[in-house]
């Protein structure tokens, strides 16, 4: 009886640890997609960057901010 209670206790602790780890992994933010231009991954939002491997890359597109200022 003691052996089965100990085994159940260990099983319960392990399942609680796995559940906690799964929640922590699910709460990690994912990389912003370029389609979500409201997400500010660059200084001017995603529209000031370019899409590289499904993520916003902020290098090389600062000219868009200058063009926007000229337009306004």
Curated annotation (Swiss-Prot):
Q: Which cysteines are joined by disulfide bonds?
A: 34-42, 37-58, 41-51, 46-56
Supply the residue numbers of the propeptide(s) excised during maturation.
Answer: 60-72
Q: What UniProt keywords apply to this chain's record, in alphabetical order? A: Disulfide bond, Ion channel impairing toxin, Knottin, Potassium channel impairing toxin, Secreted, Signal, Toxin, Voltage-gated potassium channel impairing toxin
Q: State where the protein is found.
A: Secreted
Task: List residues traversing the bilayer.
Answer: none
Q: Where is the signal peptide?
A: 1-30
Q: In which tissues is it expressed?
A: Expressed by the venom gland.
A GO CC term attached to the entry: extracellular region
Q: What is its main location?
A: secreted
Q: GO molecular function terms here?
A: potassium channel regulator activity; toxin activity
In terms of superkingdom, the source organism counts as Eukaryota
Entry annotated with the keyword Disulfide bond: yes
Q: What is known of its domains?
A: The presence of a 'disulfide through disulfide knot' structurally defines this protein as a knottin.
Role of this protein: Potassium channel blocker. At 3 uM, this toxin blocks voltage-independently voltage-gated potassium channels rKv1.2/KCNA2 (25%), hKv1.3/KCNA3 (27%), rKv4.2/KCND2 (25%), Kv10.1/KCNH1/EAG1 (15%), Kv11/hERG (12%), and Shaker-IR (10%). On hKv1.3/KCNA3, the IC(50) is 17.1 +-3.3 uM.
Misc. remarks from the entry: Negative results: does not block all sodium channels tested and several potassium channels. Does not block the following voltage-gated potassium channels: rKv1.1/KCNA1, rKv1.1/KCNA1, rKv1.5/KCNA5, rKv1.6/KCNA6, rKv2.1/KCNB1, hKv3.1/KCNC1, and Kv7.2/KCNQ2. Does not block the following voltage-gated sodium channels: rNav1.1/SCN1A, rNav1.4/SCN4A, hNav1.5/SCN5A, mNav1.6/SCN8A, and DmNav1/para.
Give the family, as the similarity comment puts it: Belongs to the short scorpion toxin superfamily. Potassium channel inhibitor family. Epsilon-KTx 01 subfamily.
Provide the protein name: Potassium channel toxin epsilon-KTx 1.1
**In which organism is this protein found?**
Tityus serrulatus
Taxonomy, top ranks, is:
Eukaryota, Metazoa, Ecdysozoa, Arthropoda, Chelicerata
